[in-house]
Amino acid sequence: MTEPLRRSVRYSGRDGSIAAARDTAAAFLDDLAPDRAAPVPGERAEEILLVVSELVTNAGRYAPGPYEMELSYCGGAVEITVWDTSSQLPRRFEPDPLRIGGHGMEIVRRLCRQVTAERVHGGKRVTARLDVDRPA
């Protein structure tokens, strides 16, 4: 069995954390190329970075204190996990194009094969799993 490629980073939640998380994720995706024998397709890479942005934005917006992001790759999928200090799970809204705001998790759920959120000691953990090569 192949060991997953992992990267974990802790953020303060201050200005610049979202850009730093995207940069970390972009570098992580670049590091996948040797394991995959090809880079992550451009459109899919952008979708992965969008999911990172949405999860990290929510952590910074709704949780006091620092948060941590872990990226892993195994079995053709990237898993993005964000831990934060709020025990409040993300709300699930019905799609509504007239609603202002609250679309982040809706976008994440649409792009990902699986999204889970659970309370853990000291806060919550949200994990999004995306197939790198989108199924036909």
Task: Give residue spans per PLM region.
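Conserved beta-strand-loop-beta-strand hairpin that lines the nucleotide-binding pocket
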Residues: 1-12, 60-136
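Short beta-to-alpha transition helix within the HATPase_c
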Residues: 7-27
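Short, structured helix-loop boundary elements
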Residues: 18, 41-45, 105
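Charged catalytic carboxylate motif
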Residues: 20, 24, 47, 51, ...
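Long, low-complexity, intrinsically disordered polar/charged segments
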Residues: 21-32, 85, 128
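A generic alpha-helix structural signal
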Residues: 22-25, 56, 112
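Conserved short strand/loop->alpha-helix "switch" segment adjacent to the catalytic nucleotide/phosphoryl-transfer site
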Residues: 29-53
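Short, well-structured hydrophobic secondary-structure segments
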Residues: 51, 56, 60-61
